[in-house]
């Protein structure tokens, strides 16, 4: 099979990369009705599989789970989760032939095997759904022409998809129809109904393409979302300890610092995150972020280039075929790093202390978010898509580090994201070592003392922060989510 993106001509590639439209609330007036009375069979019962299924059932849809025979006979975790939540469970052969919509929510590396197994069992005119388009775009999976292929991609982990639904809200979601597989022209109606059934329409839905979702998703997770957090954690910890900071305190400052810093990012973008600093610290964080952007820009561009060309995917799929040798080696090496093995700090660190003593970390977040966004947009991805795949998801990933350090992050994210994370962080750490050697007192681990600032310089820095394109689009999208939440709560 050939990489689907690489079979397109340049005009088609640009058109699919640039497909992004913010959908109006009125477009979801029918809710999930298009799928009511139809049989929806979910393959896979992991975090996305279970939680999307719970939401869809609560929205009035007929949901069941198709699992492999051995998962049922051996009563594996997927079988237990589905049955304990009262779902009908059966083998592929029992459930797939009756399905109107088969939703494939297994891990990326299992998609080809799953699709090749279910396709012959699917009835004529059925639909196949994904929540990530890797199998279609990068693997180039060929789907029978009578089958409609759609995607509904919540921009949050599965647990968050469920929690927001229970609160009467939802999570921002991308939807798409594969242009090669929409024989009856009903793909968009199916995708809209599925998105509404998960609650996504209450938080904002982008009409996208399989191509735009895959290329932007890979770029975000490799760079700012996972790779930058891993590289930053390792570099900052080593620097603090090298300068005499207690390893336990250094570990806590970093482990919980990312979450604290990015909570401000979530509420008010880079502007609010930077506003949490004193004026001298803000000027220093801005200067550091500009240096970091200059150093890291070629690395971000290389990752985007390799994603666009398919080089990244072919390398990762070669590792799949080699029993994940590289992935497992990198995972083991990460687990042995000084940051991961440092003792726990029993004392308390106040919220503002994370900002005051984490100026470099704030600079890393700002530089990484802006670089990821800029690199995606320069490659033809629309700003709204780039925002969701950079700034929006960062607090969610930072929260996983707060739970159990880098181990937890790498367990929670997909194997695809983990592989890309290691590629980036293994290149980024040595790249930034000379920069780390030149840091000044107050950049990390100590607060920058209050002092006089140049008003004109502060004015210009504030203007530069607030006028960045990610701040403009972010303000619009966060405002929409807030408005929608208000409506949902009132309703």
From Swiss-Prot:
Coiled-coil region: none
Highest taxon listed in the record's lineage: Bacteria
UniProt cofactor note: Binds 2 magnesium ions per subunit.
Reactions performed catalytically: (2R)-2,3-dihydroxy-3-methylbutanoate + NADP(+) = (2S)-2-acetolactate + NADPH + H(+); (2R,3R)-2,3-dihydroxy-3-methylpentanoate + NADP(+) = (S)-2-ethyl-2-hydroxy-3-oxobutanoate + NADPH + H(+)
Gene3D superfamilies on file: N-(1-d-carboxylethyl)-l-norvaline Dehydrogenase, domain 2, NAD(P)-binding Rossmann-like Domain
Chain positions recorded as Mg(2+) 2 binding sites: 217, 389, 393
Gene Ontology MF term list: ketol-acid reductoisomerase activity; magnesium ion binding
Cofactor(s) needed: Mg(2+)
Signal sequence interval, chain numbering: none
Pathway note: Amino-acid biosynthesis; L-isoleucine biosynthesis; L-isoleucine from 2-oxobutanoate: step 2/4; Amino-acid biosynthesis; L-valine biosynthesis; L-valine from pyruvate: step 2/4
Protein EC: 1.1.1.86
Pfam families according to UniProt: KARI_C, KARI_N
A biological process from GO: L-valine biosynthetic process
InterPro entries assigned: 6-PGluconate_DH-like_C_sf, 6PGD_dom2, KARI, KARI_C, KARI_N, NAD(P)-bd_dom_sf
This protein's UniProt keywords: Amino-acid biosynthesis, Branched-chain amino acid biosynthesis, Magnesium, Metal-binding, NADP, Oxidoreductase, Repeat
PANTHER family the record matches: KETOL-ACID REDUCTOISOMERASE, MITOCHONDRIAL
Role according to the record: Involved in the biosynthesis of branched-chain amino acids (BCAA). Catalyzes an alkyl-migration followed by a ketol-acid reduction of (S)-2-acetolactate (S2AL) to yield (R)-2,3-dihydroxy-isovalerate. In the isomerase reaction, S2AL is rearranged via a Mg-dependent methyl migration to produce 3-hydroxy-3-methyl-2-ketobutyrate (HMKB). In the reductase reaction, this 2-ketoacid undergoes a metal-dependent reduction by NADPH to yield (R)-2,3-dihydroxy-isovalerate.
Family as reported in the entry's similarity comment: Belongs to the ketol-acid reductoisomerase family.
Protein name: Ketol-acid reductoisomerase (NADP(+))
Classification lineage: Bacteria, Pseudomonadati, Pseudomonadota, Gammaproteobacteria, Enterobacterales
Gene this chain is encoded by: ilvC
